[in-house]
């Protein structure tokens, strides 16, 4: 495997970790959860210096968004270098922003699926991961849960 491609994969994984941190902040997941506590203790020192000029606005951590876009940009650069493709700065930044939205939508979709399956399999579980998925999807599902019962369908 090409080392540049492997570095691209690692920067994408870091971007995913920062995206989870962004969602934890936005949905105000409980700090008592061990997964959230670990992510805050490891990633907050990276975001704190950038909060001087990129504050948290409306629950959105702009410093974390900066890190995600920067990591995606580095990943696109490493990937294009590994495949010997032309690298365009404007296209890489725009694709980084688009991939941020795609990544957040993927995380929300999979957490919705995990929350639905978890409510069927283990409705009274105290699993920290299921708790995170439930807390992320709860604001999204609240309008549908106000509907009347549909005879066994779980919204």
Give the predicted meaning of each segment.
Residues 1-155:
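Selective transmembrane helix interface/packing segments
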């Amino acid at each position: 495997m090409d080392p540049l491609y492997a570095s691209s994969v690692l920067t994408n994984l870091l971007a995913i970790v920062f995206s989870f941190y962004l969602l934890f902040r936005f949905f105000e997941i409980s700090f008592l959860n061990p997964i959230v506590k670990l992510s805050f203790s490891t990633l907050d020192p990276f975001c704190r210096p950038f909060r001087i000029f990129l504050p948290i606005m409306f629950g959105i951590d702009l410093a974390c968004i900066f890190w995600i876009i920067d990591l995606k940009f580095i990943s696109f650069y490493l990937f294009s270098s590994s495949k010997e493709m032309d690298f365009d700065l404007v296209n890489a930044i725009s694709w980084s922003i688009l991939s941020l939205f795609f990544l957040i939508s993927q995380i929300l979709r999979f957490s919705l699926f995990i929350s639905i399956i978890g409510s069927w399999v283990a409705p009274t579980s105290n699993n920290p991961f299921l708790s995170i998925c439930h807390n992320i999807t709860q604001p999204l599902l609240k309008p549908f849960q106000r509907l009347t019962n549909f005879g066994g369908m779980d919204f």
